[in-house]
């Protein structure tokens, strides 16, 4: 009976260590900056790992009064690029902790 409790306590300590590592990795990821760009670098955006926009830079050549849709499309492309980079790095970083856990 005693061996079973010792194993349970050991397992709980391991889970607490892993939870601490996951929290540290998530905090580090949240502070990491990811840059997304539109074609020809006409628009650049910077997001943090927690999906907060920090910066947007628009090349003056991208501003055309007669074609506002072009600028909108460039912004969307840059944001989507940044979000893909955030998601990719998040999956890579956090995936090592969720591998083998059903539903994760």
Curated annotation (Swiss-Prot):
Its main location: cytoplasm. Gene3D superfamilies: Nucleoid-associated protein YbaB-like domain. Signal peptide: none annotated. Residues 1-35 are annotated as: Disordered. It comes from the Bacteria. Transmembrane segments: none annotated. Residues 8-17 have a biased composition (Low complexity). Homodimer. Belongs to the YbaB/EbfC family. This is Nucleoid-associated protein PEPE_1483. It comes from Pediococcus pentosaceus (strain ATCC 25745 / CCUG 21536 / LMG 10740 / 183-1w).
């Amino acid at each position: 009976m005693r061996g079973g409790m010792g194993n349970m306590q050991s397992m709980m300590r391991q889970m607490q260590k892993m939870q601490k590592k996951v929290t540290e990795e998530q905090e580090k990821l949240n502070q990491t900056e990811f840059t997304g760009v539109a074609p020809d670098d006409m628009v650049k955006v910077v997001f943090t790992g927690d999906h907060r926009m920090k910066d947007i830079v628009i090349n003056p050549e991208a501003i055309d009064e007669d074609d506002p849709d072009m600028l909108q499309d460039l912004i969307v492309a840059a944001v989507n690029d940044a979000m893909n980079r955030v998601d990719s790095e998040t999956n890579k970083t956090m995936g090592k902790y969720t591998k083998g856990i059903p539903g994760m």
